Design a protein with these regions (language model features):
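An alpha-beta-alpha
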Residues: 173-230
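Segments of small-molecule ligand-sensing domains
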Residues: 325-397, 408-410
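Short beta-strand elements at the ligand-binding edges of bilobed clamshell
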Residues: 156-158, 165-187, 201, 228, ...
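C-terminal motif of bacterial Sec signal peptides marking the signal peptidase cleavage site
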Residues: 30-33
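Beta-alpha junction/loop-to-helix N-cap segments that form part of ligand/metal-binding clefts
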Residues: 87-88, 99-165
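Extracellular/periplasmic periplasmic-binding protein-like sensory domains
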Residues: 253, 265-337, 350-351, 401, ...
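Bacterial signal peptide processing site
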Residues: 35-38
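Periplasmic-binding protein-like
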Residues: 126-138, 158-160, 196-201, 250-265, ...
Length: 410
């Protein structure tokens, strides 16, 4: 903690609150690596040149006037919700740069159209224009395409896909990974004395990911899986059949894990009761898909827990975003904000040439809108998540998110 306080004391005064939070954790790690003598003061951080009072108008595809260029690749020209999300992520990136206190960055905004070919071309163009890092794209196939180009040029990419199959060294995912949700909620349940677990999981790509994480985490906590069944999504008959198959095991369970969303969870609980399983006295568990006020209002979910970022950070970000752009952001807009803030911190603390795999993989991590996070060498991330509990028709924090990775149970 002493190191964190010292780091904070040497942060440049021009940093905005979000960037100061990111920089404090990054600086703490850098200072600790400089030597073992606590009394040795770190070298002063040079102040950034004063920004001009008035800047010339900029084109829509460029944000900022700094000397260090990074690319932001999004499906701005795609149709439907993809374009809406892309616009919101672009705005969030602009907000982050404005809050960065004169960061020496310039963002080159590129449209991939939501296609692999577009992402590959956008990445190539951005790197030819001098980008030293890529933020985005949004989808798994576009991250893979842009990441291939970035790796060939030894330029790091921080993307927003939740598909860990596209992550690798140099291609990092800042998204909310379902594996992290599962690990956090299972470990919390185990800390509350739960030892036997049953699960009903959707038979789809998401279900396969969370099932693998569940099978790995439960025994790691000293627990055992007494039943696990899959079901076809959207089918009441499939819910009923899966409930019958798992009924005997579920009766023995201390905790029931149902990683689904919307109307499916109450229907699955009803199917379990019809099969003779009484959920009373069993800990209901979900993932971030449960982070929905409509789901929380259902009495059948009372007492249920799931992992998610502490909502306070996002609410503050959403308020700042709405004040700046006149409408609320999409939920994933915080990812673009944190990715740009991350790049600004690295340039601020390590200089114009400082963006590298080593800097991005800082083991102390960074603190952003959605709490602390850090990247692993394989391109995936770890996040400090809160455990949320459904209570009285609402949602409250049952176990706060850790503020650092030192000694945190993640």
């Amino acid at each position: 903690m002493r190191e964190a306080m010292t780091a904070s004391s040497v942060l440049p005064t021009g940093l905005g609150p979000a960037l100061r939070s990111l920089a404090a954790i990054a600086l703490c790690s850098l200072m600790a690596a400089c030597g073992s003598t606590a009394e040795t003061a770190p070298p002063p951080v040079a102040a950034m040149p004063a920004q001009p009072q008035a800047a010339p108008p900029q084109p829509e595809n460029v944000i900022g006037t700094g000397s260090v260029r990074i690319a932001l690749i999004l499906p701005l020209g795609a149709s439907g919700n993809a374009a809406t999300a892309a616009r919101s992520l672009r705005n969030a990136a602009e907000l982050a740069l404005g809050e960065a206190g004169g960061a020496d960055l310039q963002i080159l905004v590129k449209d991939d159209g939501g296609t692999s070919q577009g992402a590959q071309a956008a990445a190539q163009q951005a790197l030819d224009e001098g980008a030293r890092a890529i933020v985005g794209p949004l989808f798994a196939h576009t991250v893979a395409a842009a990441g291939g180009v970035a790796r060939q040029r030894n330029v790091p990419l921080v993307g927003f896909s939740t598909d860990t199959n596209v992550a690798t060294r140099g291609v990092y995912l800042l998204s909310f990974l379902p594996e992290t949700d599962v690990e956090r909620v299972v470990r919390y349940a185990a800390s509350q004395g739960k030892r036997s677990f049953a699960a009903l999981v959707p038979d789809n790509a998401y279900g396969k990911v969370v099932e693998a994480a569940f099978r790995e985490t439960v025994p790691a906590t000293g627990g055992r899986i007494v039943g696990l069944e899959r079901y076809a999504t959207g089918s009441a008959a499939a819910y009923a059949e899966a409930a019958k198959r798992i009924a005997a095991g579920a009766q023995q369970a201390d905790a029931l894990f149902i990683p689904d969303a919307g109307d499916a969870v109450p229907q699955i609980l009803a199917a379990l009761q019809a099969a003779g399983v009484n959920p009373a006295g069993k800990q209901l568990m979900g993932t971030g898909l449960w982070d929905n006020p409509r789901l929380a209002a259902n009495p059948a979910l009372a007492g249920g827990i799931y992992a998610a970022p502490d909502p306070a950070g996002y609410r503050a970000f959403a308020d700042r975003y709405a004040a700046r752009f006149g409408s609320p952001p999409v939920r994933t807009a915080s990812l673009a904000h944190d990715a740009v803030s991350l790049m600004a911190v690295i340039v601020r603390t390590q200089g114009p040439m400082g963006i590298s795999d080593t800097a991005i993989q800082n083991p102390s991590g960074f603190s952003g809108v959605d709490g602390v996070f850090r990247f692993l060498a394989d391109g995936t991330n770890q996040r400090g998540l809160a455990v949320m509990r459904i209570e009285n028709g609402g949602i409250r924090v049952a176990d706060p998110a850790p503020r650092s990775f030192t000694g945190a149970a993640l």
